[in-house]
């Protein structure tokens, strides 16, 4: 049985792993639009999170399995291999394409110069080859990060990091140099609800307090608006730990430092204000708990100076060519991973990961999610294998115009990144664009 897995991030790799573990004869091709595997583990995990990035080694083991083949540089859909053609070449196709875009605030001024999504910022400092944005910190003294999840914590931390801490990472040189020259000394991370409802995890939160020459401040008055802050005993343990960390910062005495991170709560963004043709401040309405788990506006407003605004209010799935799509949830309709068309599950087409369930959970959540989808696929296998597939799909993919980057090509990229880092007196440094990546694949020094 031949199966195509579209996407080589955690959900794609765990799907491939589950397939070869549960079926003795399955052959899995893991296809990716990029020439590099690992998805958000490579292009979403903060460069200073080496322990999480080391998950690449686990995913690497999957992609090096004798019955798994990595094929990068293959676009599925418009401009690439049609989804219908892919379906003809394999007994089954599993889409693990994640949530490719970010949510917007929907407020005036959101499109001003100096206002960006956290996704754009992360892509820049992670050397995603599609990233064309730069100049994030140029001219900025104060930054506002809207959102209180782990991505918001990541970008806040990156803005407060110094060159000494960033140099040992694989961050590309242009981003490293820009952040080293940054004049940002104030970072405000803002949530519209209270601390007990924040999405960040305690480990990531505590990291903010360990940054050199940086102070974290929290308003005790804002924290006290949250009923669960006053009495955290009913809270689940993770939220309770967060509250205790915040309580400690709120009680701390001010100290002389070069940078400050201010954690703000119960502030709803209503407008980004212009100053000299770019963002100059963010305007918020104060909120209070509404007694039903949400918040309501108070009619009181506050402006926070900011020459840089990063929104981090969630990811969103995008339609996949040839598949049904639920615009409300940003997912492909499915039952246990089987794609649903016209109210009925369709054997042969499957989804796993964020495009299946929405952008929730941590990296490890994708393992049981993938296993559920693979269980559905293998239940359908007796019907699926009746299709006669004698030829290797690789030839047909090339005939369709694809130029696959096989595992040897990815290994060439890894070698080039190690050589680049050595030439700069650093460790491994990511190649920053498509041309550099493809030059490495083809052995070109140009």
PLM ranges: what are they?
Residues 3-24, 153-159:
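N-terminal Rossmann-like FAD-binding beta1-loop-alpha1 element of flavoenzymes
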Residues 26-30, 157-296, 377, 381-385:
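Dinucleotide-binding/catalytic capping subdomain of oxidoreductase cores
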Residues 35-92, 243-258, 262:
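N-terminal Rossmann-like dinucleotide/flavin-binding domain of flavoprotein oxidoreductases
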Residues 87-92, 139, 298-307:
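Core beta-strand elements of the Rossmann-like FAD/NAD(P) dinucleotide-binding domain
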Residues 92, 96-103, 149-150, 306-319:
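Glycine-/small-residue-rich beta->alpha transition segments that form the dinucleotide
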Residues 102-181, 330-340:
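Glycine-rich dinucleotide-binding loop and its adjacent helix/turn
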Residues 114-132, 272, 278, 290-357:
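FAD-site-proximal beta/loop scaffold in flavoenzymes
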Residues 338-342, 346-446:
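C-terminal, flexible cofactor-proximal segment of oxidoreductases
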């Amino acid at each position: 049985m031949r199966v195509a897995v579209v996407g080589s991030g955690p959900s794609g790799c765990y799907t491939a792993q589950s397939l070869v573990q549960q079926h003795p004869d399955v052959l899995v091709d893991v296809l990716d639009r990029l020439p590099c595997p690992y998805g958000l583990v490579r292009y979403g995990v903060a460069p200073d999170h080496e322990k999480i990035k080391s998950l690449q080694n686990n995913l690497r083991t999957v992609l090096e399995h004798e019955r798994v083949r990595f094929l990068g540089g293959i676009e599925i859909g418009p401009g690439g291999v049609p989804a219908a053609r892919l379906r003809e070449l394999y007994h089954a196709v599993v889409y693990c394409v994640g949530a490719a875009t970010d949510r917007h605030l929907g407020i005036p001024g959101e499109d001003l110069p100096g206002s960006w999504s956290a996704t754009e910022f992360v892509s820049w400092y992670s050397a995603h080859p599609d990233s064309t944005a730069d100049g994030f910190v140029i001219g900025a003294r104060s930054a506002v990060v809207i959102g209180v999840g782990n991505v918001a914590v990541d970008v806040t931390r990156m803005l407060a990091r110094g060159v000494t801490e960033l140099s040992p990472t694989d961050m590309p040189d242009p981003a490293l140099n820009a952040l080293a020259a940054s004049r940002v000394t104030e970072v405000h991370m803002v949530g519209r609800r209270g601390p007990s409802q924040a999405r960040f995890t305690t480990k990531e939160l505590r990291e903010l307090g360990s940054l050199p020459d940086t102070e974290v401040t929290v308003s005790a008055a804002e924290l006290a608006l949250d009923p669960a802050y006053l009495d955290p005993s009913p809270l689940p343990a993770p939220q309770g730990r967060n509250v205790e960390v915040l309580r400690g910062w709120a009680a701390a005495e001010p100290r002389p430092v070069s940078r400050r991170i201010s954690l703000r709560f119960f502030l709803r963004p209503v407008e980004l204000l212009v100053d000299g043709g770019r963002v100059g401040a963010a305007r918020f309405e104060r909120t209070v708990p509404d007694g039903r788990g949400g918040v309501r506006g108070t009619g009181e407003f506050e402006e926070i100076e900011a020459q840089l605004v990063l929104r981090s209010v969630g990811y969103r799935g995008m339609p996949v060519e040839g598949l049904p799509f639920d615009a409300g949830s940003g997912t492909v309709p499915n039952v246990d991973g089987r794609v649903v068309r016209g109210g009925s599950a369709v054997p042969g087409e499957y989804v796993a990961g964020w495009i299946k369930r929405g952008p929730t959970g941590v990296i490890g959540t994708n393992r049981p999610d993938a296993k559920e989808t693979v269980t559905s696929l293998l239940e359908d296998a007796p019907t699926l294998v009746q299709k006669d597939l004698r030829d290797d799909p690789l030839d047909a993919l090339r005939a369709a115009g694809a130029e696959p980057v096989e595992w040897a090509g990815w290994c060439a990229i890894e070698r080039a990144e190690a050589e680049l880092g050595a030439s700069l007196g650093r460790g491994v440094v990511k190649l920053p664009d498509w041309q550099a990546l493809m030059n490495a694949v083809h052995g070109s020094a140009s």
